[in-house]
């Protein structure tokens, strides 16, 4: 794997989130599952709890995509880039729970 392939992967992640956020919410059932989790766990900060769940699931999604594409685990630097992309969508994610 070279730097161009990694750049392409990172761009694919950006495109996936920006073009498919609604689909990701539907596919993973973020809102439906959140309603069940908050009843059982009863978090003090519901918004942070929701964001953490979404970020965790998307992080796992892209780590698995990376592994399937390159047949190696994602390195920390690329993972940080992916998490920064996910973090940039937190304002949109917050609106979903409001």
Feature-to-residue mapping (PLM):
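Amphipathic alpha-helical binding modules
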Residues: 71-98
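Intrinsic-disorder-associated interaction segments
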Residues: 2-6, 10, 14, 51, ...
């Amino acid at each position: 794997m070279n730097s161009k392939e990694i750049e392409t992967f990172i761009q694919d992640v950006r495109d996936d989130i920006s073009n498919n956020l609604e689909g990701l919410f539907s596919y993973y059932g973020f809102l439906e599952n959140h309603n069940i989790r908050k009843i059982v766990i009863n978090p003090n900060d519901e918004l942070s709890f929701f964001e953490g769940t979404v970020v965790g699931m998307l992080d796992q999604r892209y780590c698995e995509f990376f592994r399937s594409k390159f047949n190696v685990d994602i390195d920390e630097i690329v993972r940080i880039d992916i998490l920064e992309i996910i973090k940039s969508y937190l304002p949109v994610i917050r609106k979903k729970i409001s």
